[in-house]
UniProtKB/Swiss-Prot annotation:
Segments of this protein annotated with the region Disordered: 122-141
Domain of life assignment: Eukaryota
Secretion signal, residue range per the UniProt entry: none
Gene of this entry: FYV4
InterPro entries, per database record: Ribosomal_mS41 (IPR039603), SAM_Ribosomal_mS41 (IPR019083)
Protein name: Small ribosomal subunit protein mS41
Pfam families: SAM_Ribosomal_mS41 (PF09597)
SMART domains documented for this protein: IGR (SM01238)
Length: 171
């Protein structure tokens, strides 16, 4: 930062910087100092290689189901392991096969993305509710706090009873 301040103090204004540039050669601009620092500190080695998860590299249904995750592999036998049969199956047919709604919608979403080559295949994790979900959060937290207070109250009463039995408390 001191190097930056010294450059600002030396240059003063654009005219002064131009005069110095004519006399001494080019001056390092303030912008080049800022832009020379890297924007990201994470190394490239942490990024996953998604080139193998594209439409050109997936030729069987088992690989497709393993890449999209969410335990869709258990439905492999319904499609007889045939990717073409899966891609030609409609939502209504999947319903008659006995695939539950959330899994069926997930599979259809990935089928659309796969056919149109929109996104590399990967698992979309299911969201987890915190404190019973947004709608129930207040009641769940209130019950949790009430139970905690009740436990503390019972613990205090037990400690007082023990102290009274030992003769430490005289009432």
């Amino acid at each position: 930062m001191s190097l930056f301040k010294s450059l600002v103090a030396r240059s003063g204004s654009g005219i002064r910087a131009a005069q110095i540039a004519r006399q001494n050669g080019p001056v390092i601009s303030q912008i080049s100092i800022i832009s020379s620092q890297p924007f990201s500190t994470s190394p490239v080695s942490y990024k996953t290689n998604t080139s193998t998860r594209t439409k050109e590299n997936v030729h069987d249904l088992e690989t497709f189901f393993r890449l999209i995750g969410r335990n869709t592999v258990e439905h492999l036998d319904l499609f007889e392991g045939d990717l073409a049969k899966f891609l030609s199956t409609s939502s209504q047919q999947m319903k008659f096969m006995g695939i539950d709604v959330s899994t069926r919608r997930y599979m259809l979403r990935w089928k659309h993305k796969f056919e149109n080559d929109l996104e590399p295949l990967r698992e979309h994790k299911k969201g987890k509710k915190k404190n019973g979900g947004e709608r129930n959060a207040k009641t769940v937290l209130a019950k949790k706090n009430a139970l905690k207070k009740l436990e503390e109250k019972e613990k205090f009463a037990a400690e007082e009873l023990d102290a009274e039995n030992r003769g430490e408390r005289l009432f």
